[in-house]
């Protein structure tokens, strides 16, 4: 919760306090949220002694159609009949498409901010969605946030760069992007979950995505994720070297 800078400071302090004890390897793992750009290739992203997940948040590893199918199969409940993996796949894409401009705005704000003091949303946080998700609405709300922050911090608002980034991400988030399931990597999973939950409970009122997460964590398999597998191998090598 402290962000990458807070976590690094904590680890440096802990490492210093333990310096007189036996040799050890100290590493951290965190999601990148909007603090660090997502690389084109999924893999190990180690900065100092902090490892960043490839996907936007930890929930992005859980909010996947396969996990819904596994959970529903495990519950073996007739209540969720018809909520197949294919249906969840389509609903996930529908939900993500509704958030296209909002996610473009959040990504752009994350890249233009000079510190974590500037948020990437004008709502109370991830999962709290704006009332209006249109392209112009997200653009104007972002510019207001950026300008207000710049005035308070005594900075020059980089609106030109924001405009360029926003346009680029709006174009990037096209049909091919969603068909390749890249929204599962790029979009803030808490935001997508909020929209998806409404779509699912409209038909299956008793269904909870939180239960899917619990099931997915209990049965988590890192092998589909190159970055996590690299991390596992990296840690194993460090342990062997001790």
Residue ranges of model-derived segments:
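Acidic, divalent-metal-binding catalytic cores of TOPRIM
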Residues: 1-242
